[in-house]
Amino acid sequence: MTMRIAACVAAIAVSASFLLEAQVKSFRPVTEAMLRNPAPGDWLNWRRTDNAWGYSPLDQITRQNVGQLQLAWSWSMDDTGSQQATPLVYDGIMYLPNPRGVIQALDAATGDLIWEYRPGATPPPAPAAARPSGGEQTDIPRLSQRPATGGGDTGRGIQRNLAIFGDKIFGTTNDAHIVALDARTGRLAWDVKVADEKLGYEYTSGPIVVRGKVIAGMTGCSRYKEDVCFISGHDAATGKELWRTSTVARPDEPGGDSWGELPLMFRAGSDAWIPGSYDPDANLVYWGTAQAKPWARVVRGTDGAALYTNSTLALDPDLSLIHI
């Protein structure tokens, strides 16, 4: 009797996997035009559109009926760090960033989990009944519930956003990796280590996607070292780094004299805490940077502007050049 019940439970679980997979199999690749002008019910960027206006055209909720809203469902997010997440929503699927690189896909109507990705966790193999003859993976796994290992012990594990383009979801980790996942299954497509977390580097925000490039800003620039924070662009298909722009002016670069005679290892700060935005008409990416470190000029040992701290940078997404 017990074996019969277990078999029934397994059959139901496999059936549920097929139902959830059917939702994801209808996935349509996301284009640049969609990122610029999403369907009214979609939220495809941190601030919905690539220009980061944060405006939704939906009008069902009004001043008159907002008081009638009720809880439809709730979801317990990962508890390994601080939460500052903005999810993506596309075709009824919610893609949710969690602390320390954990990414989940939920049915936006019901809150049911479709898949989950955890750095360092290996997804279980598909049940035999869920494998078609061609060998294609058709079930959607919930990965191991052990704590995520990709975040290390850096910071508070904050991950503010994800990006979506083509058939992939893009995220960053607190140990300075950028990852791409199959949006249908959550399977890892590629993983690129961008900087050394042992030197303090980490991501606290996810990337944006512009003209086929995954662009992300680095943080963790409070420790003095022979390098500085930066914004980098990567091929969305492979993760290959295409360019890197320092957010601190180096001694031999334009603006380098704004730090006086300080050597590079004493030029700190200019973290890129928040995701950038894109103006397609000007073909420019805009990114904000934080203060110089130490904060006080007298402690830094310079009275200059300390470029490019406390700034909004305009970058050519193809060439990485800063437009001043």
Residue ranges and their predicted role:
Residues V228-K240, A305-L319:
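Beta-propeller blade signature
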Residues R28-L71, R250-D252:
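Blade/loop signatures of beta-propeller domains
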Residues P57-D79, S144-R146, W259-G260:
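A short helix->beta-strand "capping" segment at the edge of beta-propeller domains
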Residues I322-I324:
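Conserved small/polar residues in nucleotide/adenosyl-binding loops
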Residues W43-R47, S82-V102, D139, G150-H177, ...:
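Repeat-blade elements of multi-bladed beta-propeller folds
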Residues A6-S17:
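Bacterial N-terminal signal peptides
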Residues A108-T110, A183-T185, A236-T238, P317-D318:
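Short loop/turn segments that connect beta-strands within beta-propeller blades
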